[in-house]
């Protein structure tokens, strides 16, 4: 790509570096992958993350993401549940404890600090 065009189509990037799916797997054998597209001033990172079907618990960092593909449900430690489908725009806050149930491989474009 170029310094300006980071990906021609982020929906179809091959999976990136394999990373832990969460801090604790609670269902199935999910795998996660991450492709960092840009590191911006300070600690701001832009990338694509995906996870296969299964369930995990995690502790979040500050992040905003847009779901590109797939289907999942995220339950937050305050009891709120968010259904994730393509087009959903979600904010995560540092320190939040979450439970992810991925029903169909989930792919998201994220911006995090």
Put a short name on every predicted segment.
Residues 46-48, 64, 81, 89-91:
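Conserved hydrophobic/aromatic beta-strand scaffold that supports enzyme active sites
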Residues 81, 88, 94-113:
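Ligand-binding loop in jelly-roll beta-barrel domains
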Residues 40-60, 93-94:
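Conserved short histidine dyad/triad with adjacent acidic residue
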Residues 51, 59-74:
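Short, conserved beta-strand element in jelly-roll/cupin
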Residues 1-47:
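A short, N-terminal "cap"/entry segment at the start of jelly-roll beta-barrel domains
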């Amino acid at each position: 790509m170029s310094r300006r065009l980071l990906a021609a189509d982020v929906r179809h990037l091959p999976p990136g570096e394999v990373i832990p799916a969460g801090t604790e797997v609670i269902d199935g054998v999910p795998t996660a992958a991450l492709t960092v597209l840009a590191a911006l001033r300070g600690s701001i990172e832009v990338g694509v993350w995906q996870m296969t079907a299964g369930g995990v618990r995690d502790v979040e960092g500050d992040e905003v993401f847009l779901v590109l593909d797939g289907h999942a449900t995220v339950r937050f430690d305050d009891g709120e549940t968010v259904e994730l489908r393509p087009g959903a725009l979600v904010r995560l806050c540092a320190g939040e404890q979450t439970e992810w149930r991925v029903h169909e491989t989930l792919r998201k474009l994220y911006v995090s600090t």
